[in-house]
Amino acid sequence: MAVKTYNAGVKDYRNTYWEPDYSVKDTDILAVFKITPQAGVDREEAAAAVAAESSTGTWTTVWTDLLTDLDYYKGRAYRIEDVPGDDTCFYAFIAYPIDLFEEGSVVNVFTSLVGNVFGFKAVRALRLEDVRFPIAYVKTCGGPPHGIQVERDIMNKYGRPLLGCTIKPKLGLSAKNYGRACYEGLRGGLDFTKDDENVNSQPFMRWRQRFDFVMEAIQKAEAETGERKGHYLNVTAPTPEEMYKRAEYAKEIGAPIIMHDYITGGFCANTGLANWCRDNGMLLHIHRAMHAVLDRNPHHGIHFRVLTKILRLSGGDHLHSGTVVGKLEGDREATLGWIDIMRDRFIKEDRSRGIFFDQDWGSMPGVMPVASGGIHVWHMPALVTIFGDDSVLQFGGGTLGHPWGNAAGAAANRVALEACVEARNRGVAIEKEGKAVLTEAAKHSPELKIAMETWKEIKFEFDTVDKLDVAHK
């Protein structure tokens, strides 16, 4: 009689991948998914299916399961929670053994956690809400090339947020006119100017010419002001080889900082560029273009707090974070949550900010959040309150739209920033008393006075689409 070694056929996922009594290990990578199951699929089966498809499972029993220690390598759904106010979906907590993932590879992590499982028929919608990376995995990743303190030392700027501006119009300027716009902003008081995310090397402005004219602007502004200046030179390119070519040229001409679009450019390219920046003493600004395709739908995709953690592991010294008060999507408490994720060494679970797990970053440097998108001088008190000193406040139209020109717009923002910081340091509640603080400063700054008059009626009062589920236990 033949020996039967395994039971062929399809089994319920819950039989193998649902373990409500599992004790989480310090070395496990933990994930929480918001799952909207198909009709007729119960919660335990849906959670187990996600655990299986994002780890070792397939749709049927296979004999090769006997050739490995499946019980060690599998993902385990270990807890289910209600989503407050929405009975169509639920939270599933899943633990993955660290050995499922290649060391230092955010590419490999995402290939499992947000790979084929997102097309799985057992679920109608699936969203990765948060991930806990154990310190054992964090230490395998390079992280930010330099971090906040090293950037302050390189740029010789302390005690306040840094001030930036994205050059507009974002497309269409010649390289010479682009450099002129940078110079006017930098001499007016900005610390940085910036390429926009889609400025690469187009027919109207090739990258090398842009780099040359921008560096001329930086050097001239530094000579006039006595301050260190910079411009985020976007090295995002069609191929990694071309990206490194542009980065090398930026280093050759003396640029202190370059820029990369980490989602459209790719996580592999970003990690490589971060390593290059670390080795070559170059700061790295990260733009999040395409993030809203992934994170804005509250039921399907990847929450931005996860994209933030992935970026900190992959590497970047700056990351766009939204503004709360500007034109772009961003719930206040959720934004404060991912700002903490960027900067702090240890973040406690805080459901009021959407943080599901403790996260220990060890000695990994922090990332400076960048507030950008539809902001102007009237927003300065709120921005300084929300973001604090270790941030970049970046005004594009709020600088270049000044009736007196770029330099005046930069001067208005610099005066507003320093007035808010000085008032805050005296104990003034600047978010409440901001109007009085700015009005007093404007008595000595005609540039600020005109800026306040120009933008006094400009507000972006659309409701946030992706709101926190506030009634967590």
From Swiss-Prot:
How does the cofactor bind to this protein, according to its record?
Binds 1 Mg(2+) ion per subunit.
* Active-site residue numbers: 168 (proton acceptor), 287 (proton acceptor)
The reaction(s) this protein catalyses: 2 (2R)-3-phosphoglycerate + 2 H(+) = D-ribulose 1,5-bisphosphate + CO2 + H2O; D-ribulose 1,5-bisphosphate + O2 = 2-phosphoglycolate + (2R)-3-phosphoglycerate + 2 H(+)
Record-listed E.C. numbers = 4.1.1.39
Q: What span is annotated as the signal peptide, if there is one?
A: none
Q: Name one GO molecular function term.
A: monooxygenase activity
| Post-translational modification N6-carboxylysine, affected residues | 194
InterPro entries recorded for this chain? RuBisCO, RuBisCo_large_chain_AS, RuBisCO_lsu_C, RuBisCO_lsu_C_sf, RuBisCO_lsu_fd_N, RuBisCO_lsu_N_sf, RuBisCO_lsuI
This one is known as Ribulose bisphosphate carboxylase large chain 2
Q: What else is known?
A: The basic functional RuBisCO is composed of a large chain homodimer in a 'head-to-tail' conformation. In form I RuBisCO this homodimer is arranged in a barrel-like tetramer with the small subunits forming a tetrameric 'cap' on each end of the 'barrel'.
Q: How does it assemble?
A: Heterohexadecamer of 8 large chains and 8 small chains.
Q: Which NCBIfam families match?
A: PRK04208.1
Cofactor(s) listed in the protein's UniProt record = Mg(2+)
Q: Which family does it belong to?
A: Belongs to the RuBisCO large chain family. Type I subfamily.
Q: Which UniProt keywords apply?
A: Calvin cycle, Carbon dioxide fixation, Lyase, Magnesium, Metal-binding, Monooxygenase, Oxidoreductase
The record places the site described as Transition state stabilizer at: 327
Residues that bind Mg(2+): 194, 196-197
Which residues are involved in binding substrate? 116, 166, 170, 288, 320, 372
Q: Which GO terms describe its biological process?
A: reductive pentose-phosphate cycle
What function is annotated for this protein?
Answer: RuBisCO catalyzes two reactions: the carboxylation of D-ribulose 1,5-bisphosphate, the primary event in carbon dioxide fixation, as well as the oxidative fragmentation of the pentose substrate. Both reactions occur simultaneously and in competition at the same active site.
